[in-house]
């Protein structure tokens, strides 16, 4: 059917209201305000900046550990300490080695684990606060709207079409059907987070990939409330070892928050060999370690969530400018994979994008030639300084932790070069080995007090979708799922998804993939880790998804 869409025009359209997108909007609004106050021409307006947020509230889809380096926030909001919801400054940084029964604190905390001067934060709270500043600056911020489709103009982009609302699960209009808007803009900023669906399309269409494919990890997090005295606010610990195999890359975190709350989780690189490895089970198992068990004893689970993150670093960063478009934040691989710090880099990338757009608006030139200044600004900023030092870091661990420590140690004393520069990488899903008829493991149930099954955790994520809408997890060939994938890999989607979205259900004598899309926490692991790369995550109806309040 042909859909008539309302068309709106903006100077700047930002897709995604995370730290990168909101920093871009706020910094650009401030630049415009100073420009207009000076009497310079042309006169510009912050009201012509549009920001789309697919969540039902600003911050609802924001999840991180999180420890934040405040450098970018201090640039953006110099008096941030007066009003920003920063939970607590870091007071103690520990690096712990776990064996199954014991733990050992490294006497001198390695520099990557030293967080002096940083803050433990709730990213959701911080982003919600930033959203208020953006709206106060006159920017138009639209909640419950996702970018469903790019509007192309030659090799560039000219805006996006938002998702249609009110379609039933068969794609037929319901009584409340509302077509998506056609939003056209002089510059469109993709700030969708890791594995953004529009960014993925643009990178593929315009061949914007770098020399390495992007590498990804999945972070699984729980927020707990524990009895008083169990942990000091500002205590942060990172764990290495059990239960993560030395052949894999990953580790845990424990962060002390105010009001007897604890942020804890496990991060695993999505490039392991066993297709039936289960990151959620690994996290639940990690919690049974005596150190963690003792911390959580007498406490209760408050919130749960999961998110993918870009590990690839400098050599996996896509070209981040095209005619009429820029890529910022996690969509553009702005993450220090050694320190697992990305909030300040995302914010800085958004600010540099704002400065580039501001100059383009003044010149009324939105070509790639003009927007290329964004990349040049990055190269002359502390983003390049930080990421260049760790440009080969994650690739060092492709053959396991011991090999990784050897290479990363050499990189530490050679400014990031090491023995091989650039060190190449392979896409994570290519690491899977075949199952060769091995039986499936028993499914994890949890004890309901310390450890939990997926559905219990999903309940604590606040996830909500209208079940009568088209499935937003598009599998291009279901026959592969019921045949080749069963035999070759044992359907890894049942294991890598932290939200029980995918299951193989029996229908007579055959297996068929069942997709429980309403459980989806928007981590996009399926889009990343599927061995055949036939799953496409697209935006569901706006307002759906998790509610990461306080996370």
PLM segments and residue spans:
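FAD-binding beta-loop-beta segment adjacent to the flavin cofactor pocket
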Residues: 307-337, 457-470, 481-496, 503
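N-terminal Rossmann-like FAD-binding beta1-loop-alpha1 element of flavoenzymes
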Residues: 10-50
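C-terminal helical "tail/cap" subdomain of flavin- and related membrane-associated enzymes
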Residues: 358-452, 464
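Active-site-proximal substrate-binding core of FAD-dependent oxidoreductases
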Residues: 42-46, 333-339, 351, 355-401, ...
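N-terminal FAD cofactor-binding segment of flavoenzymes
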Residues: 27, 31, 45-100
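Predominantly flavin-linked oxidoreductase catalytic cores and closely associated redox partners
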Residues: 43-45, 133-294, 333, 352, ...
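Iron-sulfur cluster-binding cysteine motifs and their immediate structural context
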Residues: 487-514, 525-547
């Amino acid at each position: 059917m042909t859909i008539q869409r309302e068309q709106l025009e903006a100077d700047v359209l930002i897709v995604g209201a995370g730290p990168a997108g909101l920093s871009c909007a706020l910094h650009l609004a401030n630049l415009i305000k100073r420009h207009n106050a000076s009497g310079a021409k042309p006169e510009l307006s912050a009201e012509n900046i549009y920001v789309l947020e697919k969540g039902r509230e600003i911050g609802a889809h924001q999840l991180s550990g999180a420890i934040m380096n405040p450098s970018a926030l201090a640039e953006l909001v110099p008096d941030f300490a007066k009003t920003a919801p920063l939970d607590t400054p870091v007071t103690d940084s520990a690096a712990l080695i776990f064996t199954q029964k014991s733990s050992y604190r490294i006497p001198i905390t390695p520099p990557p684990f030293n967080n002096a001067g940083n803050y433990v934060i709730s990213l959701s709270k911080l982003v919600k606060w930033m959203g208020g500043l953006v709206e106060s600056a006159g920017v138009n911020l639209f909640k419950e709207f996702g970018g469903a489709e790019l509007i192309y103009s030659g090799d560039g982009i000219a805006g996006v079409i938002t998702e249609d609302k009110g379609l039933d699960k068969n794609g037929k209009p319901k009584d409340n059907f509302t077509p998506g808007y056609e939003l056209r803009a002089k510059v469109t900023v993709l700030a969708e987070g890791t594995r953004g669906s529009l960014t993925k399309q643009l990178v593929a269409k315009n061949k914007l990939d770098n020399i390495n494919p992007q590498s990804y990890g999945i972070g699984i997090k729980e927020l707990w409330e524990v009895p008083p005295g169990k942990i000091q606010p500002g205590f942060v610990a990172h764990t290495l070892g059990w239960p993560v195999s030395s052949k894999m890359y990953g580790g845990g975190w424990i962060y002390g928050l105010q009001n007897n709350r604890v942020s804890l989780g496990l991060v695993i690189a999505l490039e392991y060999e066993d297709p039936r490895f289960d990151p959620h089970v690994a996290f639940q198992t990690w919690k049974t370690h005596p150190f963690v068990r003792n911390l959580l004893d007498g406490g209760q689970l408050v919130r749960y969530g999961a998110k993918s993150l870009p590990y690839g670093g400098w050599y996996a960063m896509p070209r981040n400018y095209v005619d009429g478009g820029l890529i910022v934040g996690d969509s553009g691989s702005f993450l220090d994979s050694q320190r697992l710090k990305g909030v300040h880099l995302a914010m800085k990338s958004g600010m540099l994008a704002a400065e580039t757009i501001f100059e383009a608006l003044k010149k009324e030139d939105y070509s790639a030639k003009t927007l290329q200044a964004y990349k040049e600004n990055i190269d002359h900023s502390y983003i390049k300084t930080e990421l260049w030092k760790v440009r080969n870091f994650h690739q060092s661990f492709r053959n396991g932790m011991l090999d990784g420590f050897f290479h990363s140690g050499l990189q530490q004393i050679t400014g990031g070069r090491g023995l091989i520069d650039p060190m190449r990488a392979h896409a994570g899903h290519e690491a899977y080995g075949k199952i060769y008829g091995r039986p499936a493991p028993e499914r994890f149930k949890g004890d309901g007090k310390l450890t939990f099954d997926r559905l219990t955790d999903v309940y604590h994520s606040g996830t909500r979708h209208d079940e009568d809408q088209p499935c937003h997890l598009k599998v291009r060939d279901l026959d592969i799922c019921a045949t080749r994938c069963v035999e070759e890999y044992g359907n890894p989607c049942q294991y890598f998804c932290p939200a029980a979205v995918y299951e193989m259900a029996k229908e007579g004598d055959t297996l068929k993939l069942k997709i429980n899309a309403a459980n989806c926490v928007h981590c996009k692991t399926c889009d990343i880790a599927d061995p055949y790369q036939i799953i496409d995550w697209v935006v569901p109806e706006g307002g759906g998804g998790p509610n990461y309040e306080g996370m």
